[in-house]
Amino acid sequence: MNRLLQRQLFLENLLVGTNSMFHQISMRSINTCCRSLQRILDHLILLQTIHSPAFRLDRMRLRQMQMLACLWIHQHNHDLQATLGAIKWISP
C-alpha cells in the first residue's frame, strides 16, 4: 500500500471513530464524551511522534479538531458553566 493511500485510510478511520463517539453522546454523560475526546487527542499526539511525516497532522489541525469538539459540546449542552469546564479540560 503506498504512502498516500495509507494516510487516507488513517484519516478516514479517525473520522469514523470520532463521528461514532459523537453520535453516541445521548447515551453518555458530557464527562464521558470529554474523556473519550481526550483519548483521541492523546492518540493523535502520540502518532505525531512515532509515524513518518505522511501520517502526521499538524498542530493547527489538532487545534481545529479541539475547537470543533468544543463547539459540538456547546451545542449539545445548555449548561454554560459545564460547557466552559469541558472546554478548559479539553484544551491544553
From Swiss-Prot:
GO terms for cellular component: host cell mitochondrion. InterPro entries: Rotavirus_NSP6. It is found in: Host cytoplasm; Host mitochondrion. Its main location: host cell. Keywords: Host cytoplasm, Host mitochondrion. Interacts with NSP2 and NSP5. Belongs to the rotavirus A NSP6 family. This is Non-structural protein 6. It comes from Rotavirus A (strain RVA/Human/Japan/KU/1995/G1P1A[8]) (RV-A).
